[in-house]
Amino acid sequence: FPVLGLDSRGVGGLMNSFPPPQGHAQNPLQVGAELQSRFFASQGCAQSPFQAAPAPPPTPQAPAAEPLQVDLLPVLAAAQESAAAAAAAAAAAAAVVTAPPAPAAASTVDTAALKQPPAPPPPPPAVSAPAAEAAPPAAAATIAAAAATAVVAPTSTVAVAPVASVLEKKTKSKGPYICALCAKEFKNGYNLRRHEAIHTGAKAGRVPSGAMKMPTMVPLSLLSVPQLSGASGGGGEAGAGGGTTAVAAGGVVTTTASGKRIRKNHACEMCGKAFRDVYHLNRHKLSHSDEKPYQCPVCQQRFKRKDRMSYHVRSHDGAVHKPYNCSHCGK
């Protein structure tokens, strides 16, 4: 405040020295602003130092000047120089393409040697069969014919090539199965047996249609008959579920008329007849006994098998259809 020239009374005394204007309400803010402006006006200031100075108006910028033609002369000169260099390069490339070829060097090939006829090829080596294996008659004849052809025409390359291929085909082994009559080889035994049937005139693995089929029987000497105990029912009765008997030497194999092989491992210890399962064996054992465990509930007739008894019971109530009648008695 001493800078502004205030005395010891301070700001309060300064404000009292300037009476507020009359004619309007006493607004503290408005009165303070008026007093402040009157004070700075008396001190010779245009405005209050606490107020920000107004920003100066923007200075208008002058428009950019266009380049003169003198400034563009270096650019035009550089463009002309690049066009001249491109034309010179194109002319040099055209001169290289249209240049005549260089004269060829003198040939050092002996043309007289080329006019001479070619020398005959050397004769092929003699083909000999290995001593360890005996060649079949057909293969031996083929080898002899090939050797004769090689001796007669040693310079014929066209005739030697087919003979070599024939020898390669004939000497190639197909398998270890060889026919004893014609020495033909096969890959497996099945094909060999079919081939041997051609020599004998019989079909392999087939039974003649007129041949009589006999039931498969097993000698009793091959059977192992167990000792029957009293706990098993005794008497060899099959109705109580008798056991099975294994056939010695791996069982019996039967071949049907269609060529199907059936293995029968269960044999009857009384007659030696063989069966393929236990069911048919037990049903067969009923024929050796006199026991008839199944009885008809209507007429008390007894049967060995249950299916026979069931069929008989149906005949009592007329459930069994009998379409066949006797021509003599009508039954």
Curated annotation (Swiss-Prot):
- Indicate where this protein is primarily found: nucleus
Summarizing the function annotation, the protein's role is: Transcriptional regulator. Acts as a transcriptional activator that binds to purine-rich GAGA sites found in the promoter of many genes including insulin I and II and islet amyloid polypeptide.
UniProt subunit comment:
Interacts with BPTF.
Pfam families per UniProt: zf-C2H2, zf-C2H2_4
For region Disordered, the annotated ranges are 46-65, 108-131
Organism, as annotated? Mesocricetus auratus
Name the gene that codes for it. MAZ
- Zinc finger spans (C2H2-type) are 177-199, 266-288, 294-316, 324-331
Q: Return the GO cellular component terms, semicolon-separated.
A: nucleus
Q: Does the keyword Protein transport apply?
A: no
Q: What is this protein called?
A: Myc-associated zinc finger protein
Keyword annotations for this protein? Activator, DNA-binding, Metal-binding, Nucleus, Repeat, Transcription, Transcription regulation, Zinc, Zinc-finger
Which GO biological process entries does UniProt record here?
negative regulation of transcription by RNA polymerase II; positive regulation of transcription by RNA polymerase II
Coiled-coil spans in chain: none
- Disulfide-linked positions: none
| SMART domains cross-referenced by the UniProt entry | ZnF_C2H2
Q: Name one GO molecular function term.
A: DNA-binding transcription factor activity, RNA polymerase II-specific
Instruction: Please tell me in which tissues this protein is expressed.
Output: Ubiquitously expressed.
Subcellular localization, per the record? Answer: Nucleus
Compositional bias of kind Pro residues: 117-127
Q: Which InterPro entries match?
A: Znf_C2H2_sf, Znf_C2H2_type
